[in-house]
Swiss-Prot record:
Listed GO CC annotations: cytoplasm
EC number(s) stated in the UniProt entry for this protein: 2.1.1.257
Binding positions for S-adenosyl-L-methionine per the UniProt entry: L135, G156
Compartment(s) of residence: Cytoplasm
Keywords assigned: Cytoplasm, Methyltransferase, S-adenosyl-L-methionine, Transferase, tRNA processing
Family: Belongs to the methyltransferase superfamily. TrmY family.
Subunit-level organization: Homodimer.
Gene it is expressed from: trmY
Catalytic activity line of the entry: pseudouridine(54) in tRNA + S-adenosyl-L-methionine = N(1)-methylpseudouridine(54) in tRNA + S-adenosyl-L-homocysteine + H(+)
Protein name (database record): tRNA (pseudouridine(54)-N(1))-methyltransferase
Keyword Metal-binding: no
Function text: Specifically catalyzes the N1-methylation of pseudouridine at position 54 (Psi54) in tRNAs.
Principal localisation: cytoplasm
Lineage: Archaea, Methanobacteriati, Methanobacteriota, Thermococci, Thermococcales
GO molecular function, one term: S-adenosylmethionine-dependent methyltransferase activity
Amino acid sequence: MRTFIIKANKAHTKADFKLKDLPGTSGRIDLLCRVLNSAFLLSHGFRKNVRVWLSLYGPPNPPKAIRFEGQGMKPKTLNPDELSTAKLIIKALKVGENLREPSKEIQVLPGIYVSNLTFEDIIRRTLKGATLYYLHEEGRPIERVNFSQNVAFVLGDHEGLTPEDEAFLSGIAEKVSIGRKSYLASHVVAYVNIFLDSITPPP
């Protein structure tokens, strides 16, 4: 199983943005849509062995967590275009509007869940079943890492993780790198998937 956890510090936690202007009104929900597509979609297929957590910390009601489970999702739920993916996020945010309990998850659609879990909650839950890595330019080259069958990767949005987030990850997540340059989050996820596909047996 492969898990991708992306912390989006400005992504809106309410469906109050415009689909026609995702970059300008949503806190970069468009970036999260591209991450989801890179995580799950193949040219003629769908990755069932992937889980994605979107950890949203933008206005007005942070945090919100949206979990996408490849094993539970119907392949046709996720399409290549950003707008239809953004509509899934909007649906999840609307379903989660009245959530009060911090640990309760509500199913939005098969394989898609929304909650008020914090970034730290997600990390702690993930650590119970996977080895955790922090994708960072200054990390160990990914080619030199021996990966287990259950792996999880943490990455930030266009602004990266906060110093507090990095301090929390210190000691529990090894830094790994796909290169010394800063790449788009969706490209990083695509690269990691392709690299893991080449391992025998792949996670």
